[in-house]
């Protein structure tokens, strides 16, 4: 039976700190991809934000560390076998120290692919190939509590147009992690006699990463 996730009991954590970048000298094409970084100091279970030239498939993405050694670590569960060749980049340890606990509704969009028409005058049936995927976007209604530390952190990121790493942990332990932009002004909305809410939008920058535990 499928491990079904529901939007209940979901923990939402936002990056509160991002460590200085550690130089990455190589990323293998393997499953999982192995990262070379001298004296990186990471431990298994840490989350890192990767910047990468060449291997664009991992650029701007959040990964969990596994198989950590003094000068190397793995991108847990990430199969890089068919990815482009890595040339240079870095890794930054993420601290997910800010909790958001005021969200009341969620709508997700994006992640679907554009398709490119490849039909020629010789074809009898149209053909197409997948192009680029659209960015994943999560739109929430939040209880309007202007003193809430989580909402204050979201507004600060929004005001500064700063990227923040985000982690959703579902009740069955499945996780979604990504780097993205926050959009919120903490403007109050709602209807007569109902609770006051405020909209929050998070748009992924780079592809999300998922984990089963």
Question: In which residue ranges do the predicted regions lie?
Answer:
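Short conserved beta-strand and strand-loop elements enriched in small hydrophobics
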Residues: 46-53, 91-95, 162-171
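Oligomerization/assembly interface segments of phage tail-like spikes and tubes
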Residues: 127-146, 194-209
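Short beta-strand and beta-hairpin "edge-sheet" elements
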Residues: 167-212
